[in-house]
Amino acid sequence: MIPDVSQALAWLEKHPQALQGIQRGLERETLRVNADGTLATTGHPLALGSALTHKWITTDFAEALLEFITPVDGDIEHMLTFMRDVHRYTARQLGDERMWPLSMPCYIAPGQDIELAQYGTSNVGRLKTLYREGLKNRYGALMQTISGVHYNFSLPMAFWQAKCGVEDVESGKEAISAGYFRSIRNYYRFGWVIPYLFGASPAICSSFLQGKPTTLPFEEAGNGMYYLPYATSLRLSDLGYTNKSQSNLGITFNDLHEYVAGLKRAIKTPSEEYAKIGLQKDGKYLQINSNILQIENELYAPIRPKRVTRRGETPSDALLRGGIEYIEVRSLDINPFSPIGVDAQQVRFLDLFMVWCALADAPEMSSDELLCTRTNWNRVILEGRKPGLTLGIGCESAQFPLAQVGKDLFRDLRRVAQTLDSIHGGQAYQQVCDELLACFDDPELTFSARILRSMIEEGIGGTGRALADRYRTQLREEPLEILSEADFIAEREASVARQKKVEAEDSEPFEALLARHA
């Protein structure tokens, strides 16, 4: 089932320097909660500056949903320590509040009013909040409070020079973009390995169903918890953050211009369903527009091609201008075993896997095959640890045992690991291969199995509260290592000043901005 990557691996072993200078970044979301696990109803802490313009600390959907961002970094330990400093400083500013350590929220009552993230009075700030109002009215607020970790990854220029013979970013942007699209197609075909190893949401609180019927064969563990015995990541299931109306958009990952055309089509195609919501009620805006996507960010995807945008640019305009600059991997649940929701083992695994995705052959994929890849993901998400589970290839009928496919993949990953270890010294990447390979013989070693044992004993709420308390104490007591308190104070003040500047420079009425998004 795994493509034959032996030639590409032999090439890599002859050109190890092609992997010198991989760049990464991390984003981590987490809900602010009270000591009893209920959602905090306070505003974004003033000590954390402006959520609109702060470089490292912002908010996602809700005012209580923090998002932490690291700068681009070539050093894994430095990046994780930076992320930990942001957590340490934040933990000290939250008073009695904690950071929820799980992807799935728990103590949110059906119909509870969840305050949307607020970004001030500027047009861009108001548009961000209105976009969230649209998400709430389209999908419900509860789905939007699910948290994850995003891993941003780019291969060094040396890789593309050695692999494709490109000279620089400008002349090589077509070849580099094609290379990243190959990675994305492989990710759709084989990325289910991420929830298998690291999925950590095998259960949900009953409040999450909000009384809606479900066809999933949930088991009840008392204490208001529903779980699937072999599930890995309900966050990635249809219960979690997905968007059914998008499955027939026909967006593919074969060609940059085709991809962008599909995205632009979706933000201009009216939706009958969303038209029923309306645009305004009693003078209050309800969504940016009633198209299938209000803006490009609404496209739900487990992985995204990206380029840093310039002022006023949409994500797709940036891609057309400069090609794909990096890839955003979006399938990681919050790691409940780490105070910062992610650890070095995961980052190293993703390095290995994304390099493999860039090396392995990846035939073009129709939108039909893209939908078929979802079958494997759904199997792993809902019953990934089930003994004897099999997976298919695309829309074909042949089936292969997951455990064997995983072991075959790791045989390749080990060779990538040897190359990366030869550059960095030590055995860190090969050690990750040893640790994770064991999960295919013994699924009880996976994150989902480990956290489910605790959840069945303590409930989701009990597990989440205990971890939140432990990490709060730990983070508050640890000294800062890279950033100083003065750095955080300076960034708070600078971010507030930047927001004021944005607000002062607004020249057009908000309605004119909305008209451009119609």
Swiss-Prot record:
It catalyses: L-cysteine + L-glutamate + ATP = gamma-L-glutamyl-L-cysteine + ADP + phosphate + H(+). Belongs to the glutamate--cysteine ligase type 1 family. Type 1 subfamily. It comes from Klebsiella pneumoniae (strain 342). This is Glutamate--cysteine ligase. The lineage of its organism: Bacteria, Pseudomonadati, Pseudomonadota, Gammaproteobacteria, Enterobacterales. GO terms for biological process: glutathione biosynthetic process. Pathway: Sulfur metabolism; glutathione biosynthesis; glutathione from L-cysteine and L-glutamate: step 1/2. Keywords: ATP-binding, Glutathione biosynthesis, Ligase, Nucleotide-binding. It comes from the Bacteria. HAMAP family: Glu_cys_ligase (MF_00578). Transmembrane segments: none annotated. NCBIfam families: glu_cys_ligase (TIGR01434). GO terms for molecular function: ATP binding; glutamate-cysteine ligase activity; metal ion binding. One of its GO terms (cellular component) is cytosol. Its EC number is 6.3.2.2. Pfam families: Glu_cys_ligase.
